[in-house]
Amino acid sequence: MDAAITPIALKHQLAAFPPPTLVDVRRQPAFDADREVIRGALRRLPETVDTWAAEIDPWRPVVVYCVRGHEVGQGACAALRSRGLAARYVAGGLEQWRAEGNATQPFAAPTRWVTRERPKIDRIACPWLIRRFIDPAAEFFYVPNAEVRAFAAGEGATAYDIPDVDYAHVGPDCSFDAFIRRHKLGHPALDELARIVRAADTSALHLAAQAPGLLAASLGLSAMFADDHAMLKWGMLVYDSLYAWCREAQTETHGWYPEKLRAGATA
């Protein structure tokens, strides 16, 4: 595959799911002179690619861009590819993206979020929702329950999934529902995922046939990972796959049909 991707092809990919991880890798002086970025882009230095490459979700494609799509973007792309990532660079860089009439937006510092340690369902689902629909660069912290409010106040973070905050359980709804409601994110696929999350998180497994499976997978991940951020990394894949099912695969079935298999093998 050619490592270059055109702006129009990137635009189509960003509208698909899962979208690529998009990274602005302009050198610092170039970025300081123009602090506009493509919507959804992370900001990383090309000189430190060895460090931040480990942050990239390995199951998602990654697209980098520099000013004009020359050595900076191509070099970062090659470094990511050498680590086994499906990386591409934007042909023509940010300049070509704009020349084709595509929008940029001012760079903003990552939002910060804090909740209780040892997440299971809501405290993984909410970060997934934030990263995919609100702030791709968001930072997450897990601390003991007694320390959540003090951490939020001292570190400029927003607390969630604890009582008496904006993003919390209300009646039968869980914190995932609160994020969807406050950010007006609802659409059919996400509403279906919210029903599954709510059922698994609130012991209402009868609400969604998929909820027992999500609960089992979540408890299994918790048993596998003592590090909450390691669990978050792989929990993101769980929710990517569930959301993909909600978007595209609800009517698909699977079973064992030996006669069809035998007929196909002899055709």
Q: Residue ranges of each PLM-predicted region?
A:
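Short acidic-hydrophobic, aromatic-tinged amphipathic segments that line or gate anion-handling sites
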Residues: 43-45
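Hydrophobic anchor at the start of a short beta-strand
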Residues: 20, 62, 87-88, 138-140
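Extended, well-folded catalytic/binding cores that form a central cleft or groove in large enzyme
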Residues: 110-118, 122-259, 267
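Catalytic cysteine-centered active loop of the rhodanese-like fold, especially the PTP/DSP P-loop
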Residues: 49-96
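Long, charge-dense
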Residues: 93-102, 111
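Flexible, polar/low-complexity N-terminal or interdomain linker segments that lie immediately upstream
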Residues: 1-36, 105-126, 132, 255-259
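Short loop/helix-cap segments at secondary-structure boundaries that form the rim of catalytic
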Residues: 32-38, 150-154
